[in-house]
Amino acid sequence: MASKGGREKIKLVSTAETGHFYTTTKNKKTMPEKMSIIKFDPKARKHVEYKEAKLK
């Protein structure tokens, strides 16, 4: 049986205010700060910054 990992599920929310989001995981031990990444927003039809939010 596998042990519990240190990975946490997170939601990446678009800063273009379209309501679009991606879900992913991150290792909270090696990356304690909030994640920010540039990805494609299909609703805005361009690359925008996505910021980390809690996944409920």
From Swiss-Prot:
It holds the Pfam family Ribosomal_L33. Keywords: Ribonucleoprotein, Ribosomal protein. GO terms for molecular function: structural constituent of ribosome. One of its GO terms (biological process) is translation. It comes from the Bacteria. The keyword Ribonucleoprotein applies. Transmembrane segments: none annotated. One of its GO terms (cellular component) is cytosolic large ribosomal subunit. PANTHER family: 54S RIBOSOMAL PROTEIN L39, MITOCHONDRIAL, LARGE RIBOSOMAL SUBUNIT PROTEIN BL33M. Belongs to the bacterial ribosomal protein bL33 family. This is Large ribosomal subunit protein bL33. The gene is rpmG.
